[in-house]
Amino acid sequence: MAQKQIKVTLVRSVIGTKQSHRDTVRGLGLRRINSSRVLVDTPEVRGMIRKVDYLVSVSEA
């Protein structure tokens, strides 16, 4: 059975945010505004997304 995937897009700049939030965005593989990554939907990834939910947009892949 294929694992569920989600698409994460950086929609706001990381300028002026906490260093830990910038590190989390980089950990998700996002570099600049409107960059997107398709990631496996795991509890770890969901936790990272929840931490920076004000910076990213999430949709089904």
From Swiss-Prot:
Keywords: Ribonucleoprotein, Ribosomal protein. It comes from the Bacteria. One of its GO terms (biological process) is translation. GO terms for cellular component: cytosolic large ribosomal subunit. Pfam families: Ribosomal_L30. Belongs to the universal ribosomal protein uL30 family. Part of the 50S ribosomal subunit. This is Large ribosomal subunit protein uL30. It comes from Bordetella petrii (strain ATCC BAA-461 / DSM 12804 / CCUG 43448). The gene is rpmD.
